[in-house]
């Protein structure tokens, strides 16, 4: 099974694996599963690096972030394509819960377009299931 991992899951894998639920950990450790991440998540980690946040703990240099994800965590990085942006443009945003993070919206659109489950700890993602998101909650 292919799984799209949200940015927080990448951070937990690299820094705080104890924050991964047993169910999510089992999915990640199953060698039959293909782990993927959106280029948008890579961008978020680089932004975090520049802000001296978690990114600095994940890689020594900003430019090493992609290599760490691919080689260190064995995760494929998927580019954002035009069809992902079209899904993003059609996405109804969860304004009731104040979900205004455009990076989350791109990642959600990526998962919907590719028809793959998105693994995240963000409970606001439930809202997008009625729009086609297959969501696996890390709780």
Model-derived features: positions:
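Short, flexible helix/strand-to-coil boundary loops that buttress conserved ligand/catalytic motifs
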Residues: 14, 24, 49, 92, ...
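Active-site neighborhoods of divalent-metal-dependent phosphate/nucleic-acid chemistry enzymes
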Residues: 74-121
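Histidine- and aromatic-rich ligand-binding microenvironments
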Residues: 5-6, 38, 100-101, 122-123, ...
């Amino acid at each position: 099974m292919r799984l799209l991992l949200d940015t927080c899951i990448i951070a937990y894998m690299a820094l705080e694996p104890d924050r991964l639920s047993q169910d999510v950990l089992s999915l990640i450790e199953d060698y039959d599963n293909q782990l993927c991440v959106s280029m948008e998540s890579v961008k978020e980690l680089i932004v975090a690096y520049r802000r001296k946040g978690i990114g600095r703990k994940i890689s020594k240099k900003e430019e090493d972030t992609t290599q760490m994800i691919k080689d260190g965590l064995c995760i494929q990085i998927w580019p954002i394509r035009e069809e992902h942006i079209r899904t993003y443009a059609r996405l109804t945003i969860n304004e009731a819960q104040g979900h205004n993070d455009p990076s989350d919206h791109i990642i959600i659109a990526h998962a919907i377009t590719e028809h793959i489950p998105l693994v995240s700890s963000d409970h606001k993602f439930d809202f997008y299931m009625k729009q086609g998101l297959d969501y696996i909650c890390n709780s």
